[in-house]
Structures are given as C-alpha cells and as structure tokens.
C-alpha cells in the first residue's frame, strides 16, 4: 500500500511540473537582460531596435567588414542556417553589428552583409553608441595592431546571441558551432519554446 502511494505521489508531482525545459546545443542564457538598449541604424539608413523584429527569432553578431576570418565564417554559417530552415527562415532575422564604425560605413555594410544573404542586416552607430550596445551585451572589442592608421585589426568576441520571438535573450552560440545545430536550436525557439 505504501509503495502504491509513493508511486502515485511521484506521478502526481511529475504531472504538475509541466513540460521539460528545452535542451539546446548552444549555451542557454534565458533570463539574461542583453540587448535592451540596442538602438542603431541599419545598412539601409533605418533606425532599428530589437523591438522592430518582434515575432521573429533574432541573431546578433558583433564583427567588422575587414575581419579576416571569424566574421565571414560566422555569416557564412548563418547563411547555411537560413538555407536549412527553408521557409521558416522568413521568421528569423540575422543582425551584424559593426564594432568598427570608423571604417564600416553604411554603404560598405550595404555591400558586405547582404552578400551572405539578402535578408541579413548590418547595423552601425557612432563610436559611443557602439560602445554602449557592446556594454549592454557584455561583449568585448578592441583595436589592435597599428592603431595609428587605417590598417588596424579589431579583437572581438566571436559568439552570436539569439533572441526568441518575444525579444528575450535565449542562447549564446559559440564560434564554430555547426549550421545544423544552430538551425535545430532556432527551430526549437520558432516552436515557441
């Protein structure tokens, strides 16, 4: 009799606990308050905030157009993610935030970012606006090399932030994650999890 009560109690508790939390390939950052102050201009000259993309899953990557490796690799991976998502990709917005507004003009971003996928948007702001957005995301960037002229490089964090369709930070995707895994994670978010 006691055993029957214990089993019944365990089943009742399991039924009350709700569905299990989704599991992701990327790092789950649900509850983080990133991106609240993102207010930059896109490569078409339109002011943007994350609220502009409510209803879509949004990815945010910080980089620059003269980046020799991480940035083009990440944008290529995100292009493959969009291909894998098929029609669901229309519910995803990829944002590339330049950390080099001195060299990355609106025109340069308009040529560079959509070359990976015409739906992608490049965002830029002043030096101060860029610094404020990076601080809000708790991300790192810094000029390096010969900073006295135009041939400097920029050291920067290489991960991508993913927001759900309600505008909540949900995932941090480390550089090098596969397009297959990123697409799988985005599908979970598109399903409302």
Tell what function each PLM region has:
Residues 17-20:
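Bacterial signal peptide processing site
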Residues 50-74, 78:
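Short active-site neighborhood of thiol/selenol oxidoreductases, capturing the structured segment around
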Residues 73-133:
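Structural microenvironment flanking redox-active thiols in thiol-disulfide oxidoreductases
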